[in-house]
């Protein structure tokens, strides 16, 4: 089973830059998007053979998530069920026979960490939400988690120590998530692989110089460890400031 996650930084812009070619070529079983930057009714996307689920932010041109899946899910849920967290279209949960699929666009802590306090609350509520799902069946989480977990996960750890996405607080929350029974799938397969990133700033030729951050993830319940086959980061794919990340699962194991 092939799963892909991509922060497209605006799906309409990504379509103009070859999104559909990549989508069709990959033929994923489940394809998740973050930062769609759409309002309802703005885009009619024909994806033959896929069921589409979109969660929109109330604010125009902001945030938003989507999941395209070949198999129809048993249930669909938008958001966490907490009003203060559900206005920005950040979470979609699909239930399948053997697992839950959750895509998430984690709130950015912003310049000067203006939103760090909100981010900390979000992290705790989101982890609680995942652990509740896990009582029923294992969970696959994917998306832009807006944190580089360890120094290996970004090009310039020293100079970014207090910047959004690499604060001790954000990294600590990701550690808490893993400690609560989840696996960072890319590091599971490639614990020491350096200079593989999923996001590059548009400033200062960052992508050209590979001055990136690995902030896009597939994280799975430990109960799915035996089903993990491989993880990939498609750094060659352009069209956004992020690149797609991929997980292969064998659910028949």
Region spans (language model):
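Structured beta-strand-rich core segments of catalytic domains in phosphoester-bond hydrolases
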Residues: 37, 42-109
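Active-site-proximal beta-strand elements of phosphoester/diester hydrolases
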Residues: 1-9, 98-110, 142
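Surface polyanion/phosphate-binding segment centered on an Asp-His-Pro turn
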Residues: 232-253
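Metal-dependent phosphoesterases centered on the DNase I-like endonuclease/exonuclease/phosphatase
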Residues: 51, 125-211, 215
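Active-site beta-strand/loop signature of hydrolases that rely on acidic residues for catalysis
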Residues: 7, 23-41, 101, 130-151, ...
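Surface-exposed cleft-lining segments at the edges of enzyme active sites
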Residues: 81-82, 107-123, 158-162
């Amino acid at each position: 089973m092939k799963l892909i996650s991509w922060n497209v930084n605006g799906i309409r812009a990504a379509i103009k830059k070859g999104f559909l070619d990549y989508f069709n070529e990959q033929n994923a079983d489940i394809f998740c998007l973050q930062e769609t930057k759409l309002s309802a009714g703005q885009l009619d996307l024909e994806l033959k053979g896929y069921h589409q689920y979109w969660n929109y932010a109330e604010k125009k041109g902001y945030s938003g998530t989507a999941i395209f899946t070949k198999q129809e899910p048993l249930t669909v849920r938008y958001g966490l069920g907490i009003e203060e967290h559900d206005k920005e279209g950040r979470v979609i949960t699909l239930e399948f026979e053997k697992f839950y699929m959750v895509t998430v666009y984690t709130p950015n802590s912003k310049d000067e960490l203006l939103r760090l306090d909100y981010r900390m609350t979000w992290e705790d509520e989101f982890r609680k939400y995942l652990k509740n799902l896990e009582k029923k069946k294992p969970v696959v989480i994917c998306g832009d988690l807006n944190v580089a977990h360890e120094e290996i996960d970004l090009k310039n750890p020293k100079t970014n120590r207090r910047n959004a996405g690499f604060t001790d607080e954000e990294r600590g929350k990701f550690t808490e998530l893993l400690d609560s029974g989840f696996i960072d799938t890319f590091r599971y397969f490639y614990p020491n692989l350096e200079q593989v990133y999923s996001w590059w700033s548009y400033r200062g030729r960052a992508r050209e110089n590979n001055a990136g951050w690995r902030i896009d993830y597939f994280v799975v319940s430990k109960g799915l460890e035996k089903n993990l086959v491989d993880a990939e980061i498609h750094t060659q794919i352009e069209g956004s400031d992020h690149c797609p990340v991929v997980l292969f699962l064998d659910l028949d194991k």
